[in-house]
Structure formats: C-alpha cells, structure tokens
C-alpha cells in the first residue's frame, strides 16, 4: 500500500467552525489541522512516470498552505470492508490515465487534534468527526491497509419454527427488527409449516420489507369502523373515487412508480440513436407526477435522509412505464421549533428530544443541503417547495399534549416526461434477463421499509441508524443516461419492464418486477454487484444501497442494452431470468445452497387484511382574541415565523436553471425575491406550452378541524396554480401525501374523515382527480427523559401537490408589483367571504395559541369561479401581478408583493370594515384568496367580471395601491394604523433565512447579502446591449443548409449537454453527442468537428477536483491527449467550456495555445453551492463567441460550488487581465465590476468569470449562457424581449465565425 499526503482538507472558515464544535464538546482541545490522506493498493511497483501521473492526479482543489501536523491523529476512512463511491470513481480515473496496476485508490481525512486528551475525550472527538454508518476512525496511517483486505462472506441462518413454533419467529421478529404484526407472524408460521421447512433469515427479511406498512399501505387498504359504525370504503377506495368520477387526462394511475397525465405536443429534443445528431421529434410529451416522503431517515441523518429521499423519487420517475425522464423537482420540510441560538422566538418553548434524532435546526441546516446536492448533481432543477415549523403544547381531553414534528416531514417530488408508447409496462418474456442497473450492494439502509413503519423510538437506536441509506447521485445520473438512450430508441426500446430499487432493496424490487409481469424468477445471489463481500445473504438481498433499478430485458435485446451501458460507463449485472412458474428461487454459488425457495404468493399473496376500529375525539382549540394586539409587534412576529419568512436559504443552494426548460422558478423580478406561487417548465425548446406544479398544506389546522385542513390544502394548491395559464380547472391533477400518528387517540378518525372530505366530496365537486400519493402512518416520537416519558405527536398532515399542462408559459403571473404601468389598484379576492376565521393561523401560533374556528372551503363553486375568472383576466392581459393569500394572511401577501416590486404600499381597509378591533383579524386571517394588481382604468371591468361569476362585494374589494417610495401604510377611516419602511420589513422577513445561512455558510457572505437589503437605490437586474437582440446574424448561413458539426462533449456525471446542443442547433450547427468513452475507445476523434463544447455538470461527481478528473483522463491517456491536442492546434477549430466544462478546460491549458495565464477554479468563497441570476459585463477580447458584444451587460444563470478563479500568482492575474484574456466579469446592479457577494457569487478576483485564449478560438466561462438563450428561460427579462434572449448572440457569433 502506498500512502500519499494530500492537501489541507478544511478551508479557514470550515476549520474555525469545526474547532469551535470540538472544543465545545471537549474543552481540552486547543488546536486542529486536517489534510487528505490517499492510499493506493498497487499490484507490483509503479514506474517513475506512473508515480508522476499519480502525484498529479492527487493534486487537486484550492492551494492552501500545508502544515507539518502535530497532535493526536484521528484518521477517518471509509468503513473497513467497503469500497467507497469516491474510490470507485478515483480508481476509474486512474485506469483511464493508464495506471492499470493500481487496484484501488482510497481517501481518508487525517485530523490532528492538539490538547491533552483522555481516552474518553478521544471517543467524543471521534464521534464528532465521522459518520459511523459509512466511516471508521483509525489511530495510525498504516492501519489504512485494512481498507484493502476483505472479510469472508457470512452464511445465512434459519429460524426453527418446526421445533420452536410461533415463539421462535416472535423472537426473530425483534432481533432482526422485522416489525411484523401478530397476524403476520401467524401467517408465516402456517405458510412455512405448509412448506414443511424452516424459513431462512433472508426470506423473513424479504417478507418484512415487502409487507411493511411503508410498502403495502396496510392502513390505507384496511377495513374500518368508527364509533362502532362500519365504514363503507377503505381510505384508498375513497381516493380512487376521484379517478372513478373524473379520469379524463389520466394515462396511468395507482399502478406504477409515478402517475402519468396528458401533456402537450412539442419537438422533443434528443440525439438520434443512430447518427448521434441532436434534433427535435414532434410528439405528445406526457407528464409524470410523483411526490415521496423520506421522514424517518431525515430525522436520523438529515443530509443523507433528504438526499436519498430526492434520489428515490427521481428513480420512481425514471422507472415509470418502460423508462421516462425526470424534469423538475420540489422539496418540502415540516419540523418542530428551530430555536436558532441568539434568535429564539417568544413562542418557541424548549421541550427536549430523544438522543437518536437530530434537532429541528440541524435538520434544516443539513436536510435541505442533502436534497439540493442530489438534485444538483443529478441535474434536475428544484423549483418549488414549502417549509413550516410547528411545535406547541395543546390542551386535549386527555390533558396537555405536545404536538409537533420531531419526526419531520421531508417531501421530495417532481414531474417528468414520458413517450406515449412507453406509458404502460411491456411484456416479460420467459427467459428474459433480470438485470440490476446501477451501483453496488453495500451494508446500508438495512430494514428501512420496516423501520420507517414504526413510531420513532419504538425500535433500537442501532437499527434506526442502520436503516438510513447513503447517496451517490453521479451514479444515478449514469443510470438515467442509460434509460434515456433506451426510451430514445422508441419502438426498439430494450426495456420491457423497469422498477426502481427502494425500500427493501432488490428483495422487494425483483419479486415485484416479476410478479407485476406475471412471471417468477430464478436468481444467483453472487451475481449481485457487491462492494462489501463480507455480507450475509440477507444483507446482500435486502440492503437499500441507492441508485439502483431492476429491469427485464429480452434475450434478443440484451446485446444492444449492454452496449448502451458500456458507453455510459454504467454498471449492470444479469442476476436472474424470468420463469413461467410464479416461484422465487435464489441460489448462492458461494455456499452451494438455496437461501430463497418459495411461491411468490406466499411473499406477495394476501397476508391478513388489517381492520381499524377507532373512535372520534372532540376537536381541540383555545380562546384567541387578536383585536387588541399591537400591530407592529404582530407583524414582526409573523414575518419572523419560518412558515412566512423568506425561504432564500433553501433556494439559492439548489440549481434552478439546469435543463434550459425552466420558465418560472421561486425567485421573482429584478430583485430576485423568493415569492413565486408555482413552478413552470417549458414542454421543449420550440414551443410556449409547458407544465406547472404547486403545493398546498395547512397541517396545524387538523388539530381544530381535520377535514378543513384537507380542503384548505387543496384550495391553496389551486390558488397557487392559478398564477399559471391553465386551460381549465379539471386539467389539474393532484398528488396527496398523507401523514398521521396512527393509533394515537382520535388521529385515525381524523385521517378517515379527511380522506372522505377530499376523496368523496371536494375533489368530485371540483372535477379534480388524485391519481398518485403516498402515506406515512407513524408520525410520533417517544422517549424517556430522566425517567419522564415524553412524546411529540404530529397533527394529521395532508400535503397536496398539483400538476397541470400549461397553454402559454409567457403568461405566468408573479407577485412583483409593477411601478411602470401607470396608476394601478390592488384588489383582494376573499374566498372566506369576510368570515376572517383565525384558527391555527401563524399569528395565533406566534402567541402560543391555535384559536378555535378553522378557515375552510365553504363552497367549491366559489373556488371554481375564482379560478375561471383569474384565467380569463390573465388571458386578456388585465393582471399585472398576482399573489395568493396563505400563511401570515393578507399583510404577508401584500408585503411580499411590495418586496418583489421594490415599492411601498398605501392600504385602505375601509371597504372591509369600519371597526378598528376587526383589523388584526382582517390582516392576519388565512382564508383562501388572492391579491391582484390591475390598471385603475381596468378596475371596474375586473370587478364586474368577478361579480358576474358570483363573487360580489362581500368577497372582492379594492384595498389600496402600490406607491413609488419605501413607505408601507395601513389606514382605516383616515387614521394610519401601521406605518413602516419596506426595507426594514423586508429585513425582518429575511432574518430567519439569514440567521440559518450565517450558521451554515461563510458568515461574511451572509452579512453582505443581508446588508444589501438596506440599499436605497438598488436598481435590480437590468439589460444594456450594444446589439439588437432580435437580429439573427447567423440566418444567411443557416439558409445555405450547411450545418458545421460541433461535438457536444460529456463525461460521466455531466448533465448540461441537452440545452447546450439546443443552443448550437438553433444557431445552425449540427450538434453531435460525444461521450469521453467514445474518445478513449477510439470510436470518435475530433477531425470532423469545427467546434468542441465541454458541458456543465459533475464529471466523476467532482472526485479529484471539479473538472480535474475529466481533464486528467484527457491529459494522461495517450489516445485522448493526441485527439485534444490535434484539435486545439487547428486554426479552423473553436471550443467552449461552460461550468464543469470550464473547470475541465482550465486544467487542459497545457494543450491549448495562448492560455498560459488561465486560472483553475476552486470552492466558492461562500463555501456553498450558489445558484443565482448574476449580472455580467462582456469585456473587449478576441473571443469569437463575444464579438460585437463588448460593453454589453445582462443577467445570466449561474450554478456552481467551485467557481472561484484561482490564479497561479498575482503576476498571472495581472497578465491575464492586460493580455485581453478576460472575456466576462461579474458586475453589481449598478454596473460596477465587483468582488462582493452575492453579485459575485464565488468571490473571484476582479469579477473574472470568463476567459479566452489569445486568438479567441477557445473560451471558458463559469456562468451558463446555454440555459438562457430563449427569453422565456430567464427568471427576469425585459418586456420587449420576444423569442430570443441576449445570450443567443454568442452561439450565432460562432456560426458566423465558421464561415
């Protein structure tokens, strides 16, 4: 084993944070130093040249001064006996660089901790420094040799029920954490006594996962009686009623990994499978919809819990029908009180929590980062979501109870697209190959399905921890590329059947696959790719290692499928074959036995149906009279409540522009304020149709009136979706996520009554279907605190997500008040018709109350009329701004509109009341409704349209107007009741987000961004162009019909190739899909290409540095090096590197003439992934892409974690600047070059973010022009832009240059 020291592992900021954390736990700690340590398992000796290559491979990341380490060593390495995802990618890179004798590379972090430390101190320190699920702490570097030795496989065990009977199985149930119900134990004893043999542990584990509440939804399929009355329908039966009543537009419901609804027709853009040239195929582009929860894992390990939650939902979409494409994501979180240190709120009481779960603040620091990181690396934009905190002591008939979310809700959802012919699964032929696609098995996530089906605290802490999976999004991206290549084959798609691997691992996925296809299966356990050879059979079969799919591929299609996987470098294995008989056999060649041998109907047949016998409880509530409240204090409390406050800290960490198909993200207007009501994507690059999604939830309401909370969730979803241009209400389809503390007094009945209200009443009345959903029935946390039994129980929680096809994405409304449209009015539409019910409002919660009367949807007809009128007004161009009313009430609605519009407000409440005592209820009630901005001359017509639809004076009123200063006033009868400065109110609203950002990221950056809100004259984003945006300078060349070829180059983990191809295609190029594996295998060189474009993403998951592994596999592979060098030396060639491609090309500068002063790109100064819209200014340079654009300023999409330009020296920086190599700089909203955050999102010196070679043929940049070449792709754009955006000129310049 070779040991190679690496660079320091912590930036100054991270070092300070960790040192503070350690010294809080162990005061004896006085110092800390950390560096990477690399270990190479080598077969034989490396030559001097090979040692040099290895040395260069392992030099990556920022240049930080190396220290000589002192102090006690804590060497954190991957868990012994496993192969880490880092190792498999780094080893791949080494092999691609010709280092075949390296069997494996591994990496650890060597922490040297100074201070006089006892063994007990060392244990505490070790616990802080590693994740015990996937890592080990060693005391010496040499001990890392154990990483390369493998344990012997463990044998299976059986449970002796033939001799020990039922008791033997009952004991195994506890030991193995199976969570079997009493009647299931009886069922299994009878089944195996019938088979005349003892069950093996692998069979029991498989049965427990497949039949867990998590997988089987027993409560939703149960029979019920309530208060002694038998109920007619199951919960699921009532949900399905919505489909029976209204199934138009639904193509697949209740039977696949996601639901499918009818989409629009468009030119679906992808590479031709034969020629590899990108082009558009006109066809129906149907919409997938899915929303999952990952609550249990997120409570235990928030980053990985939320990350694998998003990953699992993405796989559900990809595994729909015969393969589909995920498109846009959403994330939601509900947790208990945050209690941010130094920013505790008056309503946040400390109640404690069990040791095994993480507190709410840490969940909200780590969980969102996990969800965002997976989406970012996979390449899916995260476009909407919600965040709520709730934890309150409530008086009940049984005494005081704490209600809240110690077991959090972590919601991961999204939408995708699928071809019409692939919506239904195909046929599994007898003898079809049963394949696992994706990553290897590892001992992680064992028993997750069963673990998430019990109340937190009812199983052992070790089993809880073992049930959390770990993530590798770059692997999932490779799998998706394989699925994409398959569906792009159309009729020749080799995938007959596909499922994702989730709860229960392949022990659940393979039986489900063959059973759904009407077949059985014969499997060989040792064919399962396995990075942990010491596992026992049940661990190999049931672990929940992520990023895996199971597929059936017929023998005739297998070779084609195999070739696709090899090109994409995606691991796969044939584990079995389909049989005629519906029997499951798993053999084990290592031990020469058959661990599983059972009829499928024993596993998946009809275990006993659950029956629920429950009683209703009185609804809860308390007295809350807001009439005397001080408005200033009430507004401040409400604006600080996390459900109301800015969600910026959740949003800027998530890429919102990847795919180039995003038409509406969360950030609104020139000041990019996070207040959008819905998310909208374009169907494709050639149309204005699209898809919209939005959410609704009012979970605390369920304590007062559970059915009302369900109706309000649906109502809020619809008032959010009303902002997009949807043909008719019934085009909207809903996903319902149900959470309940089943078994807690009154909760089962509340659940039943809510499902009934939604499924049997409101949805049928609205003409809306719920074709998909998910349930989580163990929303309770129990623990013992110094002998006191404690529990926190969630309210019944229904979270609704709505999806719909959109007729015109240009017509999406936002809350931004327009000050450039003359005199305007603000009109309130109050669907509560003046009832002003305050139940469970944010205002009540901030005073420790929940009030008594719940807002509700009193009449479905009002909701239908509202939706129809808003759509009509939008179509006619009457609406300048729109925002729905929800958390925080009317005052929040109008303030958010003012924040987005950078203006003040003059509100007159006279049309709503003449009593000052009613004002707080008017301002803070959360009845359904919206506020719209219209031109004053249109106001009479708008009011008349509402009145004609049955929404007259008791629900629609003019309540004031925006004003062109920063003053916000609220008046009644001429008396000013509230008067404040918009900037100060916006800082109050932004402070919760700022406080979390300060704890999580570089505090200096957080401070800079927060202080920007005080700037009086911030003009926001703007455009200043030195050219005509509508002038297509490439048109004369396109007319000639000659399309020069450009190589759209990608490496494993790259995810931005399609939009890049679309931009070049539009400019008149033939865009050709080229994978690095094509270059390394000699299938492609660059001779035929005029252009070479390296695209954005996460090549090799950024292992060995961002873009560096990709670059080094080009530099140190002889064939690849020759191809790149020959291309760059041609004078008729051009190249572009964007984001990850920019990082990659900056590391190739030794091959690119005239680039000796280029920097390389390292971690952002904020220490965070930054996804924003930034202003850039084009510099005077020779770049062929930027000719005629010098001096132009425009917004551009940025999304990267490592975009800080690090030059070799001060001299190199100066030289780059004076030699004309700098092509693009960040500027602030005033047009000044800046290093200040967030205008310069990575802190690059002198604002440098784009460079070119001396002759201008090769240009690199961190921002993403390929995501914003159409006007509709921009989060904000000037009104006068039509189809093209400013940055389309870049691509057309390249086309002009070629001729």
UniProtKB/Swiss-Prot annotation:
Subcellular location per the Swiss-Prot or TrEMBL entry: Cytoplasm
Upper lineage: Bacteria, Pseudomonadati, Pseudomonadota, Gammaproteobacteria, Pseudomonadales
Subunit and partners: Monomer.
Name of protein: Phosphoribosylformylglycinamidine synthase
KW Thylakoid (keyword) present: no
Annotated organism of origin: Pseudomonas putida (strain ATCC 47054 / DSM 6125 / CFBP 8728 / NCIMB 11950 / KT2440)
Gene: purL
EC number: 6.3.5.3
Family, similarity comment: In the N-terminal section; belongs to the FGAMS family.
Keywords, ordered alphabetically: ATP-binding, Cytoplasm, Glutamine amidotransferase, Ligase, Magnesium, Metal-binding, Nucleotide-binding, Purine biosynthesis
Binding site for Mg(2+): 677, 716, 720, 884
Family annotation (Pfam families): AIRS_C, FGAR-AT_linker, FGAR-AT_N, FGAR-AT_PurM_N-like, GATase_5
Reaction(s) catalysed (UniProt annotation): N(2)-formyl-N(1)-(5-phospho-beta-D-ribosyl)glycinamide + L-glutamine + ATP + H2O = 2-formamido-N(1)-(5-O-phospho-beta-D-ribosyl)acetamidine + L-glutamate + ADP + phosphate + H(+)
Keyword ATP-binding: yes
Pathway of action: Purine metabolism; IMP biosynthesis via de novo pathway; 5-amino-1-(5-phospho-D-ribosyl)imidazole from N(2)-formyl-N(1)-(5-phospho-D-ribosyl)glycinamide: step 1/2
Active site: 1139 (nucleophile), 1264, 1266
Positions with a binding annotation for ATP: 305-316, 384-386, 676, 886
